[in-house]
Amino acid sequence: MDKLTDLNYTLSVITLMNSTLHAILEDPGMAYFPYIASVLTVLFTLHKASIPTMKIALKTSRCSYKVIKYCIVTIFNTLLKLAGYKEQITTKDEIEKQMDRVIREMRRQLEMIDKLTTREIEQVELLRRIYDRLTVRKTDEIDMSKEINQKNIRTLDEWENGKNPYEPSEVTASL
C-alpha cells in the first residue's frame, strides 16, 4: 500500500510540475525555461532519492547523526560537482582518519629509525673491538729465548773434551 501511495504522490507532484511549467510557457517572454526545468528536475530527483534513503538509514542504523551528516555532505558534494567546483566538503571524521593514518606512519618511521640507530651503534662497537684487537701493542721486554731455542746453547768451552760434536770429522771409507 505504501508503494501505491508513494506512486500516487509522485504522479501528483509530476502533474503539479507539468501544470506549473505549462503556465510558465504561456508567457512568451520566458527565456530561462531550460535552466529552470533542469534545476526543478535536480531538486525533485534529490527529494525523491534522499527521503526514502534517509528513512531506511535512520531505521537500520543506531547512529543516526552520523548517517544524516554523511548524507548531507554527500548531497552538498554532488551539488558542488554539478556546479563545477572541484573542492569537496570533508567531515571531521575523515580528517581524523587522515590524521590517524599520518600519525601511524610517523610512528612506524620513528621505530625504523630507532632500529637503524641501534644497529649502527652495535656496528660501531663491534668495529671498535676489532680495531682494539688488531692494533700492535708496544712491549718493552719480550723473552725470545723460547722462540729461537737458545736456552740450551753451550759455548765451545762448555763442550765435553772441548770438542764440538756438530763439527764434521774426517770419514774414511773402505774400498
Swiss-Prot record:
Binding positions for Ca(2+) per the UniProt entry: E120, Q123
Record PTM: The N-glycosyl content is primarily Man(9)GlcNAc, with a small amount of Man(8)GlcNAc.
Single GO cellular component term: host caveola
SUPFAM superfamilies: Rotavirus nonstructural proteins (SSF58030)
Gene3D superfamilies: 1.20.5.430
Cytoplasmic compartment residues: 52-175
Main localization, broad class: host cell
GO MF annotation: an example: channel activity
Sequence ranges on the Lumenal membrane side: 1-28
GO biological process, one term: viral process
Residues in the signal sequence: none
Keywords in alphabetical order: Activation of host autophagy by virus, Calcium, Enterotoxin, Glycoprotein, Host endoplasmic reticulum, Host membrane, Host-virus interaction, Ion channel, Ion transport, Membrane, Metal-binding, Secreted, Signal-anchor, Toxin, Transmembrane, Transmembrane helix, Transport, Viral ion channel, Virulence
HAMAP family tied to this protein: ROTA_NSP4
Function: Plays an essential role in the virus replication cycle by acting as a viroporin. Creates a pore in the host endoplasmic reticulum and as a consequence releases Ca(2+) in the cytoplasm of infected cell. In turn, high levels of cytoplasmic calcium trigger membrane trafficking and transport of viral ER-associated proteins to viroplasms, sites of viral genome replication and immature particle assembly.
Subunit structure: Homotetramer. Interacts with the immature particle in the viroplasm. Interacts with host CAV1, early and late in infection. Interacts with host integrin ITGA1/ITGB1 heterodimer. Interacts with host integrin ITGA2/ITGB1 heterodimer. Interaction with microtubules blocks trafficking to the Golgi apparatus.
Family: Belongs to the rotavirus NSP4 family.
The name this protein goes by in its record: Non-structural glycoprotein 4
